[in-house]
């Protein structure tokens, strides 16, 4: 949690925890070591965090591109992702090797990614 709060402080973002028992949407290609890793957060609903994470430049509109994953298992996929999961809805990140970009995208607050 401290690393997540530090990212939020660095970018002046609100913090919203992604509890370990909640789910995020993640693309299977994240496990393949493809870069960059992209993440975006929409408003959470039900038992989800609102996070969608994928590797590569673009994500697919295919209905099975994102699979559900409990937050507690994210380290098994890519441990670098966890530090960004405290960013509030409307925030995005892109990481690749030693590169990091984090920004606010107000369009995400009206979005229905992965639906």
Which residues are covered by each model-predicted region?
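Extended, charge-biased low-complexity segments
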Residues: 1-9
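Short helix/strand-capping turn motifs
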Residues: 9-60, 69-71
């Amino acid at each position: 949690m401290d690393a997540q709060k530090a990212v939020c402080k660095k970018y002046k973002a609100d913090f919203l925890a992604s509890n370990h028992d909640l789910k995020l949407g993640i693309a299977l290609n994240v496990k393949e070591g493809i870069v960059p890793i992209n993440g975006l957060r929409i408003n959470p609903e039900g038992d989800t965090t609102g996070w969608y994470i994928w590797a590569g430049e673009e994500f697919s509109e295919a209905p099975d591109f994102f699979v559900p994953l409990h937050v507690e298992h994210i380290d098994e996929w890519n441990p670098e992702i966890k530090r960004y999961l405290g960013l509030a809805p409307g925030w995005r990140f892109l990481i690749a090797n030693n590169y990091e970009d984090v920004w606010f995208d107000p369009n995400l607050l009206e979005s229905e990614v992965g639906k």
